[in-house]
Amino acid sequence: MAAKKKKSTTRSGTNLESLNLYTFFLDRALQSYAIRDALKAMGARVEMHRDHFKEDADDVDWLPTIAGKEWVILSKDQFNWMEREAIRNAHGRAFLLVQGSLTGREQASIICGALRHMLRILNNTPAPFIAKIHRTSHVLIMPKEYRPNR
């Protein structure tokens, strides 16, 4: 009798092999060295806002540039409607960490915990999209008409 083929314990599309296909851009609100270093340690390519733009650059000005490079935007801003439209019009992809008042290490832990889900979305969802990363590392794509209550 033939031996049973061992089943993979990793769900299809959720391993980290595709991580090197993407460049993650940490915007000015999330440009922590702890996040950068944690993502790089996992094999990600990471760029930081401060290395490409002035500190006071308006989001609507740099968003199309980053989307045009096909970099994945990481932020903790819940973009206003003009910024969300700029992402969508430029066919951008953005993940927003929606939990405030966290240290860089805590943010890094949440984002790294969400990477498999983020990669699943990146590999299977065409741009443009905006997704939220929650404190539990759960990731949820926001509907196009989403408007946060403020």
Which residues are covered by each model-predicted region?
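Hydrophobic beta-strand scaffold residues
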Residues: V46, I73, A94-F95
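Non-catalytic interface/targeting segments
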Residues: M1-Y33, D37-A41, H52, N89, ...
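Conserved BB-loop
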Residues: R45-D59
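Acidic, metal-binding active-site segment of PIN/NYN-like and related structure-specific nucleases
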Residues: D59, A67-E85
